[in-house]
Amino acid sequence: MANCFGEEVDIFKLDTMSRYVGKEKKREDLAREASRLSNEDGKNDKATKYVRDLKAWYGKGVTTLCLIYNQTGDTLRYVDTVDWFGYIGQTPYPTEIGNGQWASFLHVKRSGVSSGSMAGIVYRGKDKDGRERDFMLGWSSPWGAFYRNKAYCEVGNVGSFSSRWDDLYRLVSNADYTWNAKDNGRSSVHASIGVPSSSLFIAYVETPFGP
């Protein structure tokens, strides 16, 4: 995908590292190296520049500059989304985010409407034990100086978010600048958003790993 940045951290990449040569590679190992290499070759910087360039092209108006980093040890695949306010900008949500890749996209307000950018997106991946899990990420960049930005995230069973959008709207609306979600030590998500209007929303989808 054009809006995914970085070389995928896969088994072939681990084979080039002395720590893993001749050894069995586990999902935990892939997650560890994805975490360690989060800005390899400046990929985080490139993803950030990309979404800032999208914002510059879009111009004035409330937006959310979204970055997602995959350090689960497996591929994240797009499942579903909802736009409570606004819509996806010039580039689409990536259908897949490889392990060790940054996804970068812009969510924008509707022109001529006194509302901001507020949406939720679901990606599907695997946890530490190889079970499929759904990861929900939500953000709110309101229109108007009297409202605060919000970041939210959850880990759930496959398909568990599709019937909960009304509930998730309430949860995102009452979230904070940072949010953490854990799944019994098998997976986790961390999401954050800046304070100013049109801030970066940054989410890390993670599989836990040892030293």
Regions found by a protein language model. Name each.
Residues 1-211:
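Intrinsically disordered, low-complexity segments enriched in small/polar residues
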